[in-house]
Amino acid sequence: MAAETFLFTSESVNEGHPDKLCDQVSDAVLDACLAQDADSKVACETCTKTNMVMVFGEITTKATVDYEKIVRDTCRNIGFISDDVGLDADRCKVLVNIEQQSPDIAQGVHGHFTKRPEDIGAGDQGIMFGYATDETPELMPLSHVLATKLGARLTEVRKNGTCAWLRPDGKTQVTVEYLNEGGAMVPVRVHTVLISTQHDETVTNDEIAADLKEHVIKPVIPEKYLDEKTIFHLNPSGRFVIGGPHGDAGLTGRKIIIDTYGGWGAHGGGAFSGKDPTKVDRSGAYIARQAAKSIIASGLARRCIVQISYAIGVPEPLSVFVDSYGTGKIPDKEILKIVKENFDFRPGMISINLDLKKGGNRFIKTAAYGHFGREDADFTWEVVKPLKFDKASA
């Protein structure tokens, strides 16, 4: 009898989706602040609807930042250059409502900049998760990797002119058939591929389907995962001309599963974009990913999740938890001990060890196509840390 398999699905949206537009604007503001002032305290939200983008939040920085220019440049770089495609970067309304960080939070977290890095408290309470699995070279879930890469490829063939009919907004979804091998996930095949992409008025549905198969799906999904039973839903609604902020309102922090593990593992609920590294929603999730990835890369387990939790103003995490889903070479309590001995979970030290105070175009890169499983020197949390432990006991 064949081993029992199951289906699991992950989705993604590309950079022209209104929620992702907002994530990118928020992280572009963060980048601009950190580039001039590494100690900037940033909590920047963005919302958008037809012909309007608003940035708002709390920012304390010595940087001189032209918020309107950042908004327009970000929208233009995505491809929002006319009302036809969903937004005109040069003509839309830009609203700005930025205040300083609350002094109550400032004194509790960093003592108005008087605390040493190791004494800096968490910027808020919260729970964060890191996840890793040996099913792909990225040590990420295959369903999430494929959905994300399809979205990135859609943008690539739009911007390089391969598919000139494409417009910025688009969504992807991939269903993978898996085998559970003692707690480890083994992908068997791709069951379903769904792509809904914004397009211009000139193209037919048949042309859309043919181009998506040839120029998007074929280069992204390895042939070994596709067979005659694989189902393709390519623009199943039949028409997607109106998109971007014209089609839907957008808001920072609305795509947190796409940003992380595509529904695998767990999520503490806190979004990443627009937050400086004292916000443990972001830095805590990054160090938890590095810990989980390092556990898998070191051979201690085939799949694992790490949870950490914080209290506002307190440097040390309240709890650290590890679960290897039964795939651990040693008991989970031993893996937990190794994690605690090898990783410093204090927010001020995470910032230093992962070099999270560097801006430029560092964080805007994270704001589309996932924060994890990416090969880029700026994604310092993706660097596997060699774990020091007694090899004999493992």
UniProtKB/Swiss-Prot annotation:
GO BP terms: one-carbon metabolic process; S-adenosylmethionine biosynthetic process
Note describing how the cofactor binds: Binds 2 divalent ions per subunit. The metal ions interact primarily with the substrate. Can utilize magnesium, manganese or cobalt (in vitro). Binds 1 potassium ion per subunit. The potassium ion interacts primarily with the substrate.
Annotated InterPro entries: ADOMET_SYNTHASE_CS, S-AdoMet_synt_C, S-AdoMet_synt_central, S-AdoMet_synt_N, S-AdoMet_synthetase, S-AdoMet_synthetase_sfam
Entry binding sites for ATP: 17, 169-171, 237-240, 248, 254-255, 271, 275, 279
Signal peptide feature range: none
Keyword set, alphabetical order: ATP-binding, Cobalt, Cytoplasm, Magnesium, Metal-binding, Nucleotide-binding, One-carbon metabolism, Potassium, Transferase
Cellular component, GO, one term: cytoplasm
Expression triggers: During compatible and incompatible interactions with Blumeria graminis f. sp. tritici, especially in the infected epidermis. Induced by abiotic stresses such as wounding, cold, drought, and salt.
Enzymatic reactions: L-methionine + ATP + H2O = S-adenosyl-L-methionine + phosphate + diphosphate
Cysteine disulfide links: none
Binding site for L-methionine: 58, 101, 248, 279
Class of the enzyme per the UniProt entry, highest EC level: transferase
Co-factor requirement: Mn(2+); Mg(2+); Co(2+); K(+)
One GO molecular-function entry: methionine adenosyltransferase activity
Origin: domain of life: Eukaryota
Subcellular location: Cytoplasm
EC number: 2.5.1.6
Residues that hold Mg(2+) according to the record: 11
Main subcellular location of this protein, as a coarse class: cytoplasm
Ligand binding (K(+)): 45
UniProt xrefs under NCBIfam families: metK (TIGR01034)
Function: Catalyzes the formation of S-adenosylmethionine from methionine and ATP. The reaction comprises two steps that are both catalyzed by the same enzyme: formation of S-adenosylmethionine (AdoMet) and triphosphate, and subsequent hydrolysis of the triphosphate.
Family from the record: Belongs to the AdoMet synthase family.
PANTHER family in UniProt: S-ADENOSYLMETHIONINE SYNTHETASE
Assembly with partners or alone: Homotetramer.
Protein name according to UniProt: S-adenosylmethionine synthase 1
Organism annotation: Triticum monococcum (Einkorn wheat)
